[in-house]
């Protein structure tokens, strides 16, 4: 079940994910998938253009990895790879994309409009070569790759992100380490999923809770900052997508958490 393939772009789609989590947590584990070889890149598919950033990729990954269920990571997801920029239908290999292009043309669309219509959801977006370096063919091969290399490979690649402690790649490593840690692996594997703050339109948030711990996962998908009131003072900040690692919590009265656009936090309460 490609849970996250249902989308996070609006309240209705987020509610679909929540309903599925609540329904299935008593029976087993869902497969939580943002992208695979038959779908476009998750950052490009599920996030608005203002969120096509390292922060957006980290935010999406936080939800994917910490929902109840089995998270699957597809090659390139861990560095935030995005859909390619396609200039011609001849650049595609996928027969379905070519078929959709011809259907669009027969329906009266121009070459440019037909290309735009079919390229956004083309599975070839997830089949471009893995971006290892900023060198020739993104370091994937010295030969001729089966598809063109995404033009953003000089900015998004493993080599650059290995050297950046705040990169998407190193954030995913921290995220996975928390999920697999002796202290939290039972919680994130078997813990209950409890949605919260569903009246705040831009925020998707939930608790993962077991008999001894309660952890809040909250993400702001909106373009502007948003705030929520915490049920208790934080016991521990486990992770934040902010480069400085800080979390904005006002503790002058009831603790209030403020999330910037595309910010996600993991907080033990």
Could you tell me what each predicted segment is?
Residues 238-254:
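Solvent-exposed beta-strand/loop surfaces of large extracellular or lumenal domains
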Residues 225-243:
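Beta-strand-rich binding/interaction modules
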Residues 10-27:
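Glycoside hydrolase catalytic-domain groove-lining segments
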Residues 29-51:
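Active-site clefts of carbohydrate-active enzymes
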Residues 250-269:
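C-terminal beta-strand-rich structural cap/linker in extracellular carbohydrate-active enzymes
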Residues 1-12:
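Single conserved hydrophobic/aromatic residue that forms the stacking wall/gate
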Residues 17, 51-215, 221-226:
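Loop/helix patches that line or flank the sugar-binding groove of alpha-linked glycan CAZymes
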Residues 36, 221, 269:
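Residues immediately flanking
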């Amino acid at each position: 079940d490609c849970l996250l393939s249902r989308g996070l772009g609006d309240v209705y789609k987020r509610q679909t994910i929540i309903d599925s989590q609540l329904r299935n947590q008593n029976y087993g584990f869902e497969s939580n998938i943002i992208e695979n070889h038959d779908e476009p890149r998750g950052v490009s598919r599920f996030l608005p253009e203002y969120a096509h950033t390292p922060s957006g990729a980290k935010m999406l990954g936080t939800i994917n990895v910490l929902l109840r269920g089995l998270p699957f990571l597809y090659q390139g997801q861990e560095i935030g790879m995005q859909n390619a920029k396609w200039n011609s239908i001849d650049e595609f290999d996928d027969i379905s994309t070519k078929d959709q292009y011809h259907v669009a043309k027969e329906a009266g669309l121009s070459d440019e409009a037909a290309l735009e219509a079919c390229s956004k959801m083309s599975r070839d977006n997830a089949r471009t070569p893995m971006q290892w370096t900023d060198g020739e063919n993104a370091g994937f091969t010295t030969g001729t790759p089966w598809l063109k290399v995404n033009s953003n490979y000089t900015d998004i690649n493993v080599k650059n992100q290995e050297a950046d402690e705040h990169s998407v790649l190193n954030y995913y490593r921290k995220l996975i380490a928390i999920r697999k840690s002796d202290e939290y692996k039972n919680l994130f594997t078997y813990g209950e999923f409890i949605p919260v703050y569903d009246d705040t339109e831009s925020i998707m948030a939930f608790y993962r809770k077991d008999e001894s711990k309660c952890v809040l996962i909250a993400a702001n998908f909106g373009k502007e900052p948003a705030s929520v009131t915490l049920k208790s003072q934080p016991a521990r900040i486990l992770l934040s997508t902010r480069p400085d690692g800080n979390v904005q919590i006002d503790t002058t009265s009831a603790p209030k958490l403020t999330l910037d656009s595309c910010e996600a936090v993991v907080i033990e309460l």
